[in-house]
Regions:
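FAD-binding core/adjacent interface of flavoenzyme oxidoreductases
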Residues: 7-99, 197
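A Rossmann-like FAD-binding core segment of flavoenzymes
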Residues: 12-17, 117-224, 228-230
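Short, well-ordered coil/turn residues at beta-beta hairpins
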Residues: 27, 45-46, 171-173, 199-200, ...
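Short glycine-rich anion-binding loops that position phosphate/pyrophosphate groups of nucleotides
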Residues: 47-50, 113, 202-204
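FAD-site-proximal beta/loop scaffold in flavoenzymes
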Residues: 60-91, 182, 190-264, 271
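Rossmann-like NAD(P)H-binding beta-loop-alpha module
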Residues: 76-132
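C-terminal, flexible cofactor-proximal segment of oxidoreductases
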Residues: 261, 265-318
């Protein structure tokens, strides 16, 4: 409200989007009473939801890493593991408490394990009965390299940094099943752990799925003006939308689900709504990525800026 003083903000749960009546149904307050809000223009930016049901047990025995709340949950859980590991006399329990498994070797997985490794190093000074050698970190990736979205050079650098930091890397390995204190891998191995963090699996929001909006590959289909197909006054941006991007014929034909693209989409969408109300021609979404960056923790990072690979301290600073 402080950042957007001229905007009416409502903290509520979206129950339904009624495209025929042009309204949104909300549940608000302690009693979750239903309210209808009519719209002239509807902007959908709900993102995607985690889909942990793709692997048996993952949904019930793992943390996700998609929101700030997820990050706080993982942080508090890890501190709790340190607290118990510092005082327990059960060696098997202590080993399990200090085993951390991250599933997924893309941007989210690499950044998660890098930051957790750094955080754990800082925590050690407060827990005298835990040594650095007792901490074990594992990252599991189905592909044959970390950060498969980037070049082999960047992937190899990331691999070498993680190996130096004694992070166990399981490439060309799938997660088969998860139980309450164990993960089972496709290579026949299993890892006992109290901490499983999943950075894989996305699916369309339930609200979007039930609304009748046109979908492709779990995303809302839009035109180049960010309008939902066949619905001129309904707009969609961000991870929940499949938005054409025709800037370069060699580019992937749709916008990738990154914050960099979402910010540009939001700015254009605001202009297009104004243009539509003024009955003027709308502007197409055209944007070329400036690159991608990932933090590896300990003042190291990797990424690609335009055509240049960057790594180490420079990438971390950027």
């Amino acid at each position: 409200r402080q950042m957007l003083p001229n905007i009416k903000f409502r903290k509520a749960e979206i129950i339904d989007i009624n495209l025929k009546k042009k309204n949104v149904v909300l549940a608000q307050g302690f009693r979750k009473r239903l309210h209808n809000i009519d719209y002239d223009h509807l902007v959908i930016a709900l993102g995607q939801e985690s889909n942990q049901s793709i692997i048996p047990g993952l949904e019930h025995h793992s943390f996700t890493m998609r929101t700030l709340e997820d990050a706080y949950n993982v942080r508090n859980h890890l501190i709790g593991c340190f607290e118990l590991a510092d005082v327990t006399l059960d060696k098997k329990l202590k080993k399990r408490l200090l085993n951390i498994v991250v599933v997924g070797g893309g941007f989210s997985g690499v950044e998660t394990i890098g930051e957790l490794k750094e955080m754990s190093g800082r925590l050690l000074s407060y827990y005298k009965n835990i040594s650095e050698n007792e901490l074990k970190f594992h990252i599991v990736e189905f592909s044959d390299k970390l950060l498969p979205e980037l070049s082999d050079e960047i992937s190899e650098y990331t691999l070498s940094v993680f190996k130096k930091r004694k992070i166990n890397i399981h490439l060309k390995t799938a997660l088969k099943e998860v139980s309450i204190y164990k993960v089972f891998l496709s290579n026949g191995r299993s890892i006992e752990t109290n901490t499983i963090i999943s950075t894989i699996g996305s699916t369309v929001s339930k609200i979007i799925k039930q609304s009748g909006l046109p979908l492709k590959n779990g995303k809302i289909i839009t035109n180049e003006f960010l309008q939902v197909l066949h619905l001129e006054n309904v707009w969609a941006i961000g991870d929940s939308a499949l938005i054409p991007n025709k800037l370069d014929i060699n580019d992937y034909p749709y916008s990738p689900p990154t914050a960099q693209f979402a910010v540009r989409q939001a700015k254009l969408l605001a202009k297009n709504i104004i243009l539509k109300n003024m009955k003027k021609n709308l502007r197409e979404f055209r944007y070329k990525s400036k690159g991608s960056l990932a933090s590896l923790g300990s003042k190291k990072g990797v990424g690609k800026i335009y055509f240049f690979n960057v790594k180490g301290l420079l990438a971390w600073i950027i």
